[in-house]
């Protein structure tokens, strides 16, 4: 998943808060993942059999398989290498793929498509509501989730998006079994980089319904990059994956270094793709037809279905020809339709949408702080990237740099998924192929109070690289101890220690001042290198943790996950108590420092007020020494409120501000 730099943006806070709160705590983010190399997965591979790779697309899906070191993109029963993600119900049967799409014009209300726009979402999601208005089929609310309501055998039936997606996945499974001549039970399935956990899990559930064990849910841009073989390049490369499909647009910027993939930034538009280009052309011709014939053809769903089909064909033709003719017999009220569409007119109708695709490209470069000139490769994914003007605009944006065109853009994602499927199934010839695995447990680092500061959730795609700025927890602290843990519990004592090391020689400075950059780099062989450096002195230390050192068995992983659920409430309470104590200590420390600063607040209040605040701070400090071990969360919060009640009347005379609310405290770094 994406690389995230947790430099939390400070929330707006008042002048009073500005005076009394320092940047005191730091986050210690470090993560470690499980093994990613095929050779490390021995026994499980034996039961996988052939693992297929499926690109489950919004408008089209594609399936591939790796055999003897070679990837085959498989053809369906119509001889096509891509299959429409369509499901339809007639009075006699259920249709999936080409057959479903081909009868769409005659049966629009019972033909389901674009189900990927609904999967894993809630019914009241604004995107779902927007889409539902344009679908010819009915989308209904059931338990807060969108369901499709259609007539099946003349009986109303409600289907979940997972069930519909399962029908498409089942078709891809059937295609693979027809090619291989044997049963297929395992698959790698791809999803857009912006899919959240719910959407990913729903996709896996769809696989289960289809009789497939989805071993991996892989990000589409990463699969596409593998398809282009960029992972075999030794030097670090910055790669733009530009994925313009039928219904969605996704841009990702990846850094690839010796097989380690790092998604630096992702942007896109969930409602921009080939269908939108088709709609522009349809709107143009509908306007012409209505004007010529003095009718409103949009009310004729079957006529609109015919036009949709022919416009898509015309668009494809214009990628290789300068003009094409659209002919539809008995289009509306027995009248035929006949119009010419030139490439120039097609580009004119869609130029604003084509240019709109460059905004996410600019966004990912800006987010990752990468210049256009630093991009090494441009990878095209999705059938809409065949449009000449789209390619021209993108290449012009990058100063004339040519996009990679080594693989059919319709097939790039499925190709990469098939490579990973081949690795998982232990196919001959995949010894040098690296698989991006997922970490089996959450990984993080210990911070003040023994808290497990979680950085990487379990089931995050690897390889990856992370880095973060840390600081010290005490004045003049000469050493920081970095302890890497894995597990699902809130306290590190309940998790598994993977390794630790110290960074020493930190020059004397107040707490929170030193800047210590900690980075970790997990390669494809499951070897983690943790590196810490003091940005002030340049001094650095590192540790290497291999995949067989301190790792848990599957049984232990299962037990820890179960325990995490069982003790979730207990963990939550303990963590809240530690956080309440840290908040009180930090507040008292900040208050004392500000009052003693003669160039700041200390020079603006009289001695009596200063002593009043210092006495209150001393009282809290003594209370902490006597009661911290046994106090409750509420006790710590009460002490903080009492201290605030002493300080606020004094400071409000200076600033006239409202009291600081806990939500106004600046976000900072957890303390080690």
Swiss-Prot record:
Residues 1-38 form the signal peptide. Induction: By heat shock and tunicamycin. Not induced by carbon source starvation. It catalyses: ATP + H2O = ADP + phosphate + H(+). It comes from Aspergillus niger. A motif (Prevents secretion from ER) lies at residues 669-672. ATP binds at residues 57-60, 116, 246-248, 312-319, 383-386. GO terms for molecular function: ATP binding; ATP hydrolysis activity; ATP-dependent protein folding chaperone; protein-transporting ATPase activity; unfolded protein binding. This is Endoplasmic reticulum chaperone BiP.
């Amino acid at each position: 998943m994406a690389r995230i730099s947790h430099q939390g943006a400070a929330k707006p806070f008042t002048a009073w808060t500005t005076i009394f709160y320092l940047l005191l705590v730091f986050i210690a983010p470090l993560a470690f993942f499980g093994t990613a190399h095929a050779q490390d997965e021995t026994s499980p591979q034996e039961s996988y059999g052939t693992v297929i790779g499926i690109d489950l697309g919004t408008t089209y899906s594609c399936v591939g398989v790796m055999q003897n070191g070679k990837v085959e993109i498989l053809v369906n029963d119509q001889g096509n290498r891509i299959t429409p993600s369509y499901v339809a119900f007639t009075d006699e049967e259920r249709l999936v793929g080409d057959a479903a799409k081909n009868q769409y014009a005659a049966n629009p209300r019972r033909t389901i498509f674009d189900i990927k726009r609904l999967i894993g979402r809630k019914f009241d999601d604004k995107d779902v509501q927007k889409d539902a208005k344009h679908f010819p089929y009915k989308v209904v609310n059931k338990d807060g989730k969108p369901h499709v309501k259609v007539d099946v055998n003349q009986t109303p039936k409600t289907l979940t998006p997972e069930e519909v997606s399962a029908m498409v996945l089942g078709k891809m499974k059937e295609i693979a079994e027809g090619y291989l001549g044997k049963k297929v039970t395992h698959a790698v399935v791809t999803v857009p980089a912006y899919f959240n956990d719910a959407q990913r899990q729903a996709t896996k559930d769809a696989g289960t319904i289809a009789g497939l064990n989805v071993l991996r849910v892989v990000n589409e841009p990463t699969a596409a990059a593998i398809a282009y073989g960029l992972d075999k390049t030794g030097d670090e490369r910055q790669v733009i994956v530009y994925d313009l499909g039928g219904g969605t647009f996704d841009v990702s910027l990846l850094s690839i270094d010796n097989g380690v993939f790092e998604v630096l930034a992702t942007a896109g538009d969930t409602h921009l793709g080939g269908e939108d280009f088709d709609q522009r052309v349809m709107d143009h011709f509908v306007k012409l037809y209505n004007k010529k014939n003095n009718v409103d053809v949009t009310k004729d769903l079957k006529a609109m279905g015919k036009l949709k089909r022919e416009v898509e064909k015309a668009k494809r033709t214009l990628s290789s020809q300068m003009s094409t003719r659209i002919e539809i017999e008995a289009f509306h009220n027995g009248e035929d339709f006949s119009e010419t569409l030139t490439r120039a007119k097609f580009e004119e109708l869609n130029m604003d949408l084509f240019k709109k695709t460059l905004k996410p490209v600019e966004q990912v470069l800006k987010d990752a702080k990468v210049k256009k000139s630093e991009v090494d490769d441009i990878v095209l994914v999705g059938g809409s990237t065949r449009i000449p003007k789209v390619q021209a605009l993108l290449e012009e944006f990058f100063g004339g740099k040519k996009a990679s065109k080594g693989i059919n853009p319709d097939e790039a994602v499925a190709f990469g998924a098939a490579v990973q499927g081949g690795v998982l199934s232990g196919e001959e010839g995949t010894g040098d192929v690296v698989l991006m695995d997922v970490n089996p447990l959450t990984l993080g680092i210990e911070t003040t109070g023994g808290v497990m500061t979680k950085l990487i959730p379990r089931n995050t795609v690897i390889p990856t690289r992370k880095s973060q700025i840390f600081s010290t927890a005490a004045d003049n602290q000469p050493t920081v101890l970095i302890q890497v843990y894995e597990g699902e519990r809130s306290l590190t004592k309940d998790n598994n220690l993977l390794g630790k090391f110290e960074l020493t020689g930190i020059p004397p400075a107040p707490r929170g001042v030193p800047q210590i950059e900690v980075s970790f780099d997990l390669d494809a062989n499951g070897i983690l290198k943790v590196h810490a450096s003091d940005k002030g002195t340049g001094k650095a230390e590192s540790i290497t943790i291999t995949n067989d050192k301190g790792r848990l068995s599957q049984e232990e992983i299962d037990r820890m996950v179960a325990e995490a659920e069982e003790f979730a409430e207990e963990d939550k309470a303990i963590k809240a108590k530690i956080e309440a104590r840290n908040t009180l200590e930090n507040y008292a420390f900040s208050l004392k420092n500000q009052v003693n600063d003669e160039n700041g607040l200390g020079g603006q209040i009289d001695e009596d007020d200063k002593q009043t605040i210092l006495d209150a701070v001393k009282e809290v400090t003594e209370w902490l020494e006597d009661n911290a071990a046994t106090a409750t969360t509420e006790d710590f919060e009460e002490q903080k409120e009492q201290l605030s009640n002493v300080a606020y009347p004094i400071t409000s005379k200076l600033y006239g501000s409202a009291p600081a609310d806990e939500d106004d405290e600046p976000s900072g770094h957890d303390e080690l």
